[in-house]
Amino acid sequence: MIELGVNIDHVATLRQARRTWEPDPTWAAVEAHLGGADGITVHLREDRRHIQDDDVRRLRELTQIKLNLEMAATDEMVGIARSIKPEMAMLVPEGRHEVTTEGGLDIVSQEARLKDVIARLADAGIVTSVFIDAEIAQIDAAARIGARVCEIHTGPYAHAFHAQGRDAESPAVLAEIDKIRRAGEAICSHGMRFNAGHALNYYNVQPIARLPGIRELHIGHAIVSRAVFSGIREAVAEMKRLMREAAAG
């Protein structure tokens, strides 16, 4: 059955706006779990703009569902991951001037370095995921470096969906869906796990959730935005219902 990993970074964004102690991302993780989340995702950025080191430690200690740590492939982050031991570490590109992750990781240009990073994480018992664009060359490279999971960047699909007035049958949207579908087939052919995420929301999630072979979606901003009005538990539960409805056909 398809799973939902809830990204709670923007709960921390709200807290950091006042440099105070609330809202607490750990409590958001608990509420997300109660709403049906299968995992919690946080991005410990090098500039610590939202999630802090202590947040990750507390989440590791207190949450009862799997923890996915998004991270740059740096020595500092590898050391933190090896110490905290999340169930999964997702390698992402990172730029200090970006508002959010703007594209997939370019594995092809840095295979040797990323292979070493994955080996160091695996040595600590951590499954490694890579966040990549829906490109066959990147998927093949992910398999070569030993990634266990590929998360396909759904931003281009989400942007097309919005630009086309939420028309899931428009040629532009169908082209993006087909690109992700073909990427998923390639991922599965390598024996890797097919995940997806980025800019998914309550309007565009179902065409992605019904793709063959897809295992998990990571969604954050849309859920936190909805939770401002409806509460995290209800927001997560509604997203999970939409995904399951789509996956069931």
Curated annotation (Swiss-Prot):
Residue positions binding 1-deoxy-D-xylulose 5-phosphate: 9-10, 45, 50, 100
Record: residues binding 3-amino-2-oxopropyl phosphate: 7, 18, 199, 220-221
Site, as annotated: Transition state stabilizer: 151
EC number: 2.6.99.2
Catalytic residues in the record: 43 (proton acceptor), 70 (proton acceptor), 198 (proton donor)
Catalytic activity annotation: 3-amino-2-oxopropyl phosphate + 1-deoxy-D-xylulose 5-phosphate = pyridoxine 5'-phosphate + phosphate + 2 H2O + H(+)
GO cellular component assignments: cytosol
rRNA-binding in keyword set: no
Record's protein name: Pyridoxine 5'-phosphate synthase
Organism from which the protein derives: Azoarcus sp. (strain BH72)
